[in-house]
Amino acid sequence: MTGNEYQELSKRTIATPMDKKEEMLNHGVFGLTAEAGEVSSLLQKVYQGRPIDPVHMKKELGDVLWMVAEICTAMGFELDEIMQLNVDKLKARFPNGFTVENDLNRAKGDI
């Protein structure tokens, strides 16, 4: 499945009307924050002596992805494009893989 296919399939469960892009954007951003908190909570439980439940983690990461797709839909972005832009940015920043030196010495304007 491509990112765009996922995005298209996920649209059927967006509760905000498609013509209410600002509301959709707000819902996606607030939802992303909440779902990231769910992922953090799973990791936090490790410090309480519990193992990470991989099935639960996969479900929460799916919720994170759904929120990212909703944000893309609200902004008129294609998820495949966002994925490619991110990979291109990381290739430029870390041409031979991650290094602390490259991370500390990013090009001007690298965000």
Task: Report the location of each language-model feature.
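Flexible "arm" and connector segments at domain edges
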Residues: 1-111
